[in-house]
Amino acid sequence: MRRGVETIASGRTERPYGTFTSYEAFDRTDDSQLERVLSNVRPDVLLDLACYRPGEVEAATRLFKGDRYVFVSTGVYPNLDGRPAREEDFVPLDGEPPAELDYLGGKRWCETMLARTRDFPWTVVRPPAIFGPSDHTLRIAAYLERVADGGPLLVPAESYERQAGLAWVKDVGFACALACDLRRDAHRKAYNVAFEGVSLRDLIEGIARAMGVAPRLHPIPYAELPDGASPYGPDPRRAAGYVLDRARRELGFEPSALEDALAETLAWYRVARPSHPGYANRPQELAVAGAA
């Protein structure tokens, strides 16, 4: 806004917005509504935060006539068996998307549809698991409440000390703003966005320091983790976080310190007291750790 950029938010539900951001309510699954809003607003940049259906991306590529479409994706990479992922590790898929897709599969197909366009001006931001205040997945709450109760935390022995795929919501927002800056050459490129060098162990120990308690980690084989015990995994078959070289070099992105993210997230936790559904199995976890 300080640079004279008008920001317009949108979604299916009408919402009251403040002085500096206006709002357009529409259903993106209805092409006529999407076309109407894009025609009326005529955005230079379209930031797509929530899409994981390839048909909706295809509609955007047909109807958006601006300068840059920024698609927020996820860790679309194949299993890399503990190697940090680089942007080029994702290869667009062959064939046509199936009728039913989970979130990860949907994001992969969305990126595939973008890659199949000829000249469409897309840019992709790829965050891994995102946490921060009001995290609707409650995954970060799973670790906060387990550290707070003083019992042991079950972690995957194969992967808890290697770099994990984690990002702070503010860092992802900053990366999106950088990607929306038309002065940067991000034409038809993807960018990794995450913490750097932060493992699951670092996360848990950071939470414990912020709470003033001693962390109690109990490593066990990944395959033996009870459901919901460690929502961030990490699955040892997956990538060990991201390589951030391209985002640094081309966008000017730098990840924040873990401590800054935890301070803000812990303040939310202490007020809201959220609980992850997997915490219902806490007695089973304690029994596995021999602490029941």
Ranges and model annotations:
Residues 111-134:
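Conserved beta-loop-beta element that borders a ligand/cofactor-binding pocket
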Residues 5-12, 16:
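Conserved glycine-rich Rossmann-like NAD(P)H-binding loop of the short-chain dehydrogenase/reductase
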Residues 106:
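Active-site helix of classical SDR
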Residues 14-67, 71, 77-79:
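NAD(P)H-binding glycine-rich loop region in Rossmannoid oxidoreductase-like domains
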